[in-house]
């Protein structure tokens, strides 16, 4: 009898334990009671919608805390909508599906946008003056909005290509426009510059301007860039007077691919009076070093400012070792070529020299050049602030 009672007691305890387990589990997630039948909620970067179809034991509700995801429920279908992803990085959000006391999580994924415009390694287009049209590979996973800043420039995106067209430039001057693209409201506008320029566009009258190494004043020589020198030789030449009778001619190089003027150091430019052989000599105004070597230490990249002004800063091109070729001197020698043994002295010390084309049709107020660390920066000044240089021998 005792044995039978023990067995009965054990059975009651097992029944009680089993009942307690079921009661404790009530209200917690039970996997498998909400089933995902199908879903298409992995998106590219565009704003778009997808759905999740479920089988659930009761009415379905859904929750997602990500602000770029919105949801609605229509029976067993959950509608999911995402905004555009204006980041290169992908993003994920957790969608929590609930039915009664049960829930199930599923991930909403959206990839970052992809934009790839291939100019063959270049970051801007530098063209000749002839009419131009070319389609460039262009991949964008977001819809593009494209415009241009100039009537002579057009850009059309279609079938994975951006077709850029420019009308013939017959203005006689370099010109620059911009292709402006964005991914619609909320995205930042991006630009690609397109310049049309040939060597002949550089011909004309210029301010050959600089900060005077003695006074710091912004001054200039009225000058001309021409395609023929006084001896009838073809090329590119900068001509200017350093007195009423003495004309200097500085030979220039021309890089047509990059639209850059190359300046070779220590070129014989002409005579000052009957005794002095004038040369352009590169100068690091910080260290005080000068160099008599016949090398290309300085370049001047042609630019077109927003008002149409043609502008070229004469800057260091990195070939003078640790020295900075940001300035130059007009230097007198007792003969040519320029050598240490025949130097006489500097006539003009030119800090941050630049060329600015004089154009009637452009806002041609000269641009001041000043030092900001190692960088150059431009600021418009009035023409009254710019003084024609009146050279005085300083040696």
Residue ranges, per PLM feature:
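A short beta-strand micro-motif common to beta-rich folds, especially ectodomain repeats
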Residues: 88-101, 172-185
